[in-house]
Amino acid sequence: TWFGKTGKTDALLSVIMRKRGNIYQSDGEHAPNKEKPAALFAKGSVGITDSNKAGASLRLYRNNTTEPGNSTQTHGDSGLRDRKTVQNDVQFWYQYAPVDNSLINVKSTLYLSDITIKTNGHNKTAEWRNNRTSGVNVVNRSHTLIFPGAHQLSYGAEYYRQQQKPEGSATLYPEGNIDFTSLYFQDEMTMKSYPVNIIVGSRYDRYKSFNPRAGELKAERLSPRAAISVSPTDWLMMYGSISSAFRAPTMAEMYRDDVHFYRKGKPNYWVPNLNLKPENNITREIGAGIQLDGLLTDNDRLQLKGGYFGTDARNYIATRVDMKRMRSYSYNVSRARIWGWDVQGNYQSDYVDWMLSYNRTESMDASSREWLGSGNPDTLISDISIPVGHRGVYAGWRAELSASATHVKKGDPHQAGYTIHSFSLSYKPVSVKGFEASVTLDNAFNKLAMNGKGVPLSGRTVSLYTRYQW
């Protein structure tokens, strides 16, 4: 990566090349995989005048892989495929922000993304598809003082069009197009006399898709939101929010009818569902955070943050995999409930850096009271870094503990809990600014671990990392 800045001009260039082989999993098997990804990213900007600025970015991505049709299968019986991905992204933007007018800071962005994927499978004709997205986004930000405080206003509009063209035997992504339009407004207010921040806003989305087989689908929604945070002391912050949103079904969710994956040589096919309805939901969140300085030593800091959220969804779009009939399809859950907790803590001092986090997410069909299986069981992650001596050497220990996954879809097997330990050693010399090197041993004891969907996690893995920034 190279970055440079001179006067009113700045630029960045990044090149990434990787090579990856079979994935060693915690059940002792190797998931068949071979890939050679390469990416180039370049961006730059120039200040034309004090009020005018323009920039552009370019991203090129190439990847040649040999992988199974179903990446969740451990054994190579899912049918290996040669897959080539070519992606080109380009973006241009212009910003006008007069220094003597706090009400005007407008930025316009034009973007184009073009992705071509070609796949050749054993005993199968070639698949080819192209996905092109082009759009424009305009947003203005205004700062003003209006009773009872300071306001930061953000308002704008976005439009994009997505086109998909398949050839060969590719029907997973059918021919068609999507037009998406949105208008949005937000006011973030900081009260003058009280330690209170208030955010109110709304967003209007309009979605239209067309497919020669199924015709036209239209959906629109006005989604308001509001949030408030209160800081009664310099060490305590409390917050709450309520927001609504909608999600229209994608073309793939409605029309796909290709092979989803193979198991023991038998294909599991996608079944189209042309009757999918748009999803609407309301999410409520509440939480609090504290920060304490100089708790045990003069230079230490303790940060704690915890929150709870609950989402009520109408026509929730879910996916069902029927292993008995060997078919998969998207469907609407008339009423769904998703909720969860998230707690994070961090203690920093000259002697230790310790991060601790806890998460749990549940999802349920509110009508039948059956689990949807898209949540996460109780998971606790502890990450400790301790300096060794005074020469920039740090020893790390990461432990991930997950409870058993029992709240799964009806008919799906329960997954046992697991504990994974990883160790690391890193070097950040004070005399060489910007240099960092580390070695990490993930899943050090090579424990068998499955996620909630039954996919084996990685087994014992050694990673080497180095970076130098100047």
Where are these regions (language model features)?
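Predominantly transmembrane beta-strands of Gram-negative outer membrane beta-barrel pores used
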Residues: T1-P32, A39-G47, G55, G306, ...
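Membrane-embedded beta-barrel scaffold of Gram-negative outer-membrane proteins
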Residues: G4, T9, N105-G121, Y239, ...
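Transmembrane beta-strands of outer-membrane beta-barrel pores
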Residues: T6-K8, M17-G21, L60-N64, L112-T116, ...
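Short loop/turn motifs that connect adjacent beta-strands in outer-membrane beta-barrel proteins
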Residues: G7-K8, D50-K53, P98-N105, H143-Q152, ...
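Flexible loop and strand-edge segments within Gram-negative outer membrane beta-barrel domains
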Residues: R20-N22, S26-D27, A31-P37, S51-V106, ...
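Surface-exposed extracellular loop regions of Gram-negative outer-membrane beta-barrel proteins
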Residues: S71-Q73, R206-F210, E216, V230, ...
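Signature of Gram-negative outer-membrane beta-barrel scaffolds
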Residues: A150-M237, S241-S243, A248-T250, V259-R263, ...
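Gram-negative outer-membrane beta-barrel transporters
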Residues: M191-I198, D298-R314, Y329-V408, E436
